[in-house]
């Protein structure tokens, strides 16, 4: 956990590492964390919005609409078939008391806090030897953004425009900085210098 008023920057996971982690967590019967990481990586939702999801919102559906906690804006999301299947599998193993229950409930019966999720993610990072420096809830949203950008590398400006809208950023420059692209571009400048 970071100190209050200190700045830490979450890093993204390489997509293949994120997908492997989702599978490993499910194999190890850690279905709640597998589902959390899958939802974060496939939807790009903020952790506050993931924690507010109920089973009835995401189970047996292709699309669902939320009101974002941070912005108050309504947002419709689509779940691809693989994610839908993973949700159903996790639901079957977790066996919530009712489908109106929140999806990420602790053993005490309360919704996980963001702080607790971050502690768990740090434990997961260590246990599964993830190659990421700062791994937190926000890493999932950044992983989503990086994958969307990487999949559209031949038309990166269009990808950035889409991500800017999805993330509700006010400019492409903010989205680039958010994804760490601006820093990479700056550092690449040094590579072009020759002696």
Locate each region found by the language model:
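DNA breakage-rejoining catalytic core of tyrosine-based enzymes
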Residues: 1-19, 73-81
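Basic, Lys/Arg- and aromatic-enriched nucleic-acid-binding interface segment
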Residues: 2, 13-43, 154-155
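Active-site/catalytic core of tyrosine-dependent DNA strand-transfer enzymes
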Residues: 19, 82-132
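Alpha-helix N-cap/helix-start motif at helix boundaries, enriched for small hydrophobics
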Residues: 36, 44, 48-53, 163
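Active-site-proximal segment of tyrosine recombinases
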Residues: 49-50, 145, 153-169
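Conserved tyrosine-mediated DNA breakage-rejoining catalytic core shared by Y-recombinases
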Residues: 52-83
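Catalytic-site neighborhood detector that most strongly recognizes the C-terminal catalytic loop/helix
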Residues: 68-72, 167-192
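Short basic/aromatic active-site micro-motif
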Residues: 131-151
């Amino acid at each position: 956990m970071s100190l209050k008023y200190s700045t830490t920057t979450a890093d993204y996971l390489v997509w293949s590492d994120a997908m492997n982690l989702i599978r490993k967590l499910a194999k190890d019967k850690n279905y709640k964390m597998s589902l959390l990481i899958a939802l974060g990586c496939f939807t790009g939702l903020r952790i506050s919005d993931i924690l507010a999801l109920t089973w009835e919102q995401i189970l047996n559906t292709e699309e669902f609409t939320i009101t974002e906690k941070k912005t108050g804006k309504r947002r419709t999301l689509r779940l691809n078939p693989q994610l839908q299947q993973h949700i159903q599998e996790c639901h079957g193993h977790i066996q919530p008391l009712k489908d109106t229950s929140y999806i990420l409930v602790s053993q005490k019966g309360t919704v996980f806090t963001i702080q607790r999720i971050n502690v768990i993610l740090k434990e997961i990072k260590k246990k599964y030897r993830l190659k990421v420096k700062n791994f937190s809830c926000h890493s999932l949203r950044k992983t989503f953004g990086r994958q969307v950008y990487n999949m559209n590398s031949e038309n990166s400006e269009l990808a950035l425009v889409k991500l800017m809208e999805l993330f509700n950023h006010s400019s492409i420059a903010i989205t680039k900085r958010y994804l760490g692209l601006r820093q990479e571009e700056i550092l690449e400048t040094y590579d072009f210098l020759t002696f």
